[in-house]
């Protein structure tokens, strides 16, 4: 049976039936084990081959050991290349359709045997590969290109197959393809590495992604801004901020100037890593690099400060933003309404809210919710209730946050019945209460002496399948403890030891934040052993709990588990870990962690550097104190005044008064400290 490929050509392409009348050894495309690696050996028969069976890697014959000599022989005996290919005479769509009907390698090779003498250009074959999305067929097609048709190996062909293999998450085979490229003396290019790095990174395999990045740098293949930016964004989304910072450092070391998007991402990263000064300094660096900060840059920095309750710093950034005439947007204004409220600047918050429309900025539900909360916290209950009802009269959107805010306001006025009525009202309007709604009403009822109603609601929530969040559990525990029902509170805590209706990570966080060290420890160890701890913040939460309770051995235990799991600690965790090593007198380990993190490109806040100085001092290693002091002294990112004061204090504590005096005199000489009056 034959099908016609193109009306202008006398060539025809055999369409093979899906079942064959004879038996042969083959691997069907649909049944190849996913876990099979490229370097495993299988016996496969291939048509158009001088040997009926032979050992092959998963998809192809093993490349000859002596690659150089084999390629020389190939060139020597290669037929004269036709100047005119048959590309335009072959219908690629029909050829692809025929390829899709093949069930194994033998059928595919037989189908393509018509073109074994390379009547089609390598460009045509690469295009064919790029349109074949099935990773198994694309591998077999690549084998035919190199082993049957004897095309010169092409990095473009490998790149296309790598893409298909990685889309199918066949990472072991991707490794094998890369090794095969090396064996064929092909140099992986930027696209090769970009595909590998991005694919491994998207799957959260950052150690592997960074390993590919290291190989790329060793091969002197230059990365581009897009590649580094993608890695930074992937790290940020996975909350691995130390790796994002490390990649950003590599980007700049490569001589690439970050663009506005990269800078804005890094402002967010530094903020999430609690490196606030570094986040602020990026604005300065952007100006120096000729990349003007925009509204997103400033609003991102504002968000960083607000999330960490640094409201005065946010006020300073907003003033700078207005000074440089950077346009304000709704996000920025909403943030600043919140900031004004947090700083008890209610008039400023009120003025900004009511002036939004004058600036041609239409307030949204977030704007209304924020000013409602500001009114409530300032105990301007009349204004809050008036605005809430005004929203309803003007059909302005209200959501669960709006109602939660108003329920909380009624709780402050001890009007628990009105709060209860609001819960019923929101449900009648089709607004579903959430965990915060329930925890707020339970808290209000508890304070009003309506514990029976609170307990009944909590029990209904547990049996109804509603998500029980940290706040809700803690609220009920506190409600029981307030009235002396310690048995009920302990039963809830006991339930959290073996949670069957909430994730273990949630249980750990609840217990840790409640200061329940023993219970949190028990659940954490069980969860870690069973591989349930996936969130990096859970490790940080446990380290923080142990550090607060001076359980330094446990701090080190969790840190080592964290590193075993492949997570990078943030600067706060590093500070607590260094302190724990110091308390345990394990100075060498502290020094190792400090150096390793710096080599990875971590940027430490001053407190970490100062803590390391303190550890060296505790060890009586003043040579290291002086060495680190001199290095930090030349670092423009370190607060010079605080550095000198810390070092002087360390020398003074060790009775090295001459050295302490020397450091203080150096401060005066450099104008850091005012000289004594004459």
Swiss-Prot record:
PROSITE patterns assigned to the protein according to its UniProt record, in alphabetical order: PPR (PS51375)
Organelle targeting peptide span: 1-64
Classification lineage: Eukaryota, Viridiplantae, Streptophyta, Embryophyta, Tracheophyta
GO molecular function list: mRNA binding
Keywords, sorted A to Z: Chloroplast, Plastid, Repeat, Transit peptide
Organism of derivation: Arabidopsis thaliana (Mouse-ear cress)
Gene3D superfamilies listed in its UniProt record: Tetratricopeptide repeat domain
Stated name of the protein: Pentatricopeptide repeat-containing protein At5g39980, chloroplastic
GO cellular component, one term: chloroplast stroma
PANTHER family tied to this protein: PENTATRICOPEPTIDE REPEAT-CONTAINING PROTEIN (PTHR47942:SF63), TETRATRICOPEPTIDE REPEAT (TPR)-LIKE SUPERFAMILY PROTEIN-RELATED (PTHR47942)
Record-linked NCBIfam families: PPR
Major subcellular site: plastid
Compartment list: Plastid, Chloroplast
Example of a GO biological process term: chloroplast RNA processing
Family in the record: Belongs to the PPR family. P subfamily.
Annotated PPR repeat ranges: 154-188, 189-223, 224-258, 259-293, 294-328, 329-363, 364-398, 399-433, 434-468, 469-503, 535-569, 570-604, 605-638, 639-674
């Amino acid at each position: 049976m034959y099908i016609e490929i193109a009306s202008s050509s006398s060539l025809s392409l055999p369409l093979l039936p899906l079942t064959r009348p004879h038996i042969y050894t083959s691997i069907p495309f649909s049944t190849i084990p996913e876990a099979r690696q490229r370097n495993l050996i299988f016996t496969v028969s291939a048509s158009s081959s001088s040997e009926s069976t032979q050992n092959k890697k998963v998809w192809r014959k093993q490349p000859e050991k002596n690659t150089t000599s084999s390629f020389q022989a190939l060139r020597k005996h290669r037929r004269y290349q036709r100047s005119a290919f048959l590309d335009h005479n072959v219908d690629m769509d029909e050829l692809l359709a025929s390829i899709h009907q093949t069930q194994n390698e033998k059928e595919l090779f037989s189908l393509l045997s018509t073109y074994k003498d390379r009547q089609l250009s390598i460009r045509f074959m690469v295009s064919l590969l790029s349109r074949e999305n099935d990773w198994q067929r694309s591998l077999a097609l690549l084998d035919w290109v190199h082993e049957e048709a004897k095309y010169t190996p092409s990095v473009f062909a490998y790149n296309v197959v790598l893409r298909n293999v990685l889309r199918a998450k066949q990472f072991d085979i991707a490794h094998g393809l890369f090794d095969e490229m090396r064996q064929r003396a092909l140099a992986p290019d930027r696209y090769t590495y970009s595909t590998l790095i991005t694919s491994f990174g998207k799957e959260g395999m950052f150690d592997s992604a960074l390993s590919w990045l290291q190989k790329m740098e060793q091969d002197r293949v230059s990365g581009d801004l897009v590649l580094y930016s993608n890695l930074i964004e992937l790290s940020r989304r996975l909350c691995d901020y130390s790796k994002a910072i490390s990649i950003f450092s590599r980007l700049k070391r490569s001589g690439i100037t970050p663009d506005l998007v990269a800078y804005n991402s890094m402002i967010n990263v530094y903020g999430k890593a609690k490196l606030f000064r570094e986040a602020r300094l990026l604005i300065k660096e952007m100006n120096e690099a000729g990349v003007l900060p925009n509204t997103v840059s400033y609003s991102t920095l504002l968000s960083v400060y607000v999330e960490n309750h640094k409201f005065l710093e946010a006020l300073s950034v907003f003033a700078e933003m207005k000074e440089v005439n950077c346009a304000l947007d709704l996000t920025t204004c909403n943030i600043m309404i919140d900031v004004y409220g947090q700083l008890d600047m209610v008039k400023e918050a009120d003025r900004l809210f009511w002036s939004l429309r004058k600036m041609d900025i239409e307030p949204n539900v977030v704007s209304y919710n924020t000013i409602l909360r500001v009114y409530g916290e300032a105990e301007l209950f009349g204004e809050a209730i008036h605005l809430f009802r005004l929203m309803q009269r003007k059909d302005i959107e209200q959501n669960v946050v709006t109602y939660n805010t108003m329920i909380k306001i009624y709780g402050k006025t001890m009007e628990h019945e009105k709060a209860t009525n609001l819960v019923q009202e929101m449900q009648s309007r089709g607004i579903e209460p959430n965990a915060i709604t329930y925890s707020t009403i339970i808290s209000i009822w508890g304070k009003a002496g309506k514990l029976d109603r609170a307990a009944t609601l909590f029990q209904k929530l547990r049996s109804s399948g509603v998500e029980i969040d940290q706040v809700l559990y803690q609220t009920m525990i506190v409600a029981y403890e307030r009235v002396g029902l310690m048995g009920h509170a302990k039963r809830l805590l006991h339930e959290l030891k073996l949670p069957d209706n909430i994730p273990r990570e949630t249980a750990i966080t609840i217990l840790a934040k409640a200061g329940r060290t023993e219970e949190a420890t028990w659940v954490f160890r069980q969860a870690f052993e069973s591989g349930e701890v996936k969130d990096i913040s859970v490790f940080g939460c446990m380290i923080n709990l142990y550090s607060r309770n001076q359980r330094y051995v446990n701090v080190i235990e969790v840190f080592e588990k964290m590193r075993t799991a492949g997570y990078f600690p943030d600067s706060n965790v590093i500070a607590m870990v260094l302190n724990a090593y110091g308390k345990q007198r394990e100075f060498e380990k502290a020094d190792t962690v400090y150096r390793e993190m710096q080599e990875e490109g971590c940027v430490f806040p001053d407190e970490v550097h100062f803590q390391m100085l303190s550890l060296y001092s505790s060890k009586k290693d003043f040579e290291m104190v002086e060495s680190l002091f001199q290095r930090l002294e030349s670092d423009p990112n370190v607060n010079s005044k605080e550095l000198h004061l810390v070092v002087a204090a360390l020398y003074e504590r060790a009775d090295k008064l001459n050295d302490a005096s020397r450091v203080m005199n150096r401060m005066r000489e450099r104008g850091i400290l005012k000289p004594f009056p004459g």
